[in-house]
């Protein structure tokens, strides 16, 4: 009798884990939540459009780059000539950094200039605040939160 209960319990546990993993995969879960190396969003990063912009942070907000992706963080940067959305990365990664970027900070952002929903934006590779640098992507645009590198 105990072995039958054990089999039923183990089966229920396995099914529960499998269903949970399937739900995570549909939302991006372990694959970066829509922010990973192979995601449609990440493929917008173009090393030929990398530039550095400087300005003052006007807003720091969460956003979802597309349906089904986990929330990310972007900031609105006011430069001398424009107001520009700067996409930093997934919220779970940005919010777990030692330092934070605040409204009013003067920053230098290096990243790929893209059109996002018809508006200019920068997908950030790094953000410099004083002497501190928040590294978000390598020179190829591969996110540091991916946990691995392609050679």
Q: How should these model regions be labeled?
A:
Residues 93-109:
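Short nucleic-acid-contacting surface segments enriched for D/E, G, S/T with interspersed K/R
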Residues 8-18:
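Bacterial N-terminal signal peptides
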Residues 29-52:
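Short boundary/loop segments of OB/S1/cold-shock single-stranded nucleic-acid-binding domains
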Residues 66-88:
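OB-fold (S1/OB) nucleic-acid-binding surfaces
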Residues 49-69:
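Structural detector for short beta-strands of small beta-barrel domains
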Residues 114-143:
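OB-fold/S1-family single-stranded nucleic acid-binding modules
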Residues 54-57, 104-112:
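OB-fold and OB-like beta-barrel modules that bind single-stranded nucleic acids
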